[in-house]
Amino acid sequence: MTTQARPLQLGIAIAAALAGLALAGCNKPDTPPEQKVSAGTELDDAVITTKVKSALMTDNLGKGGDTSVETRKGEVMLSGFVDNQAQADREVQLAKAVDGVSSVQNKLMIKDGKSTAGAVLDDSVVTVKVKSALMTDDQTKGTEIAVTTNKGVVQLSGFVDSTDEQARATSVARNVEGVQSVVNDTSIKK
């Protein structure tokens, strides 16, 4: 009995080991790990950002001073508050015309009326407070999130690592005094 049972036990042990190895392969994350951006790509992105900002600042219709420009792997994100749809459309058109731009995300928001000097100052203070809160939070990369405020509405933009970081940034911003609402227009890094 022991001589015939041994091959059976050995076969069962081998099958169990192979099944364990097969199941171990199922424990992989759904999303591939983020590909690191090379120093050359970061430099290219910085040049693209500078060229887009320059194009926005020198255009008569666009008022690029109120527009945040973020670039990652040639993808440009425009965010902030503009006076009207024509200005937003023009800024997108200008960004698309810059050499090296592969695509443009339009996260520009239309202002709802004129702001008083006091309201602009209040918005500036809120922006600084939110930016500071994001910088000191250990779960967000505040240096990679742009913050713009108009009449207490805070817009977050830029490229973040995960949906968890997006949610955390929104939560941090909402808890800042003076924030009426938060629009999170960040995108997940590809």
Which residues does each predicted region cover?
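N-terminal targeting leaders
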Residues: 2-190
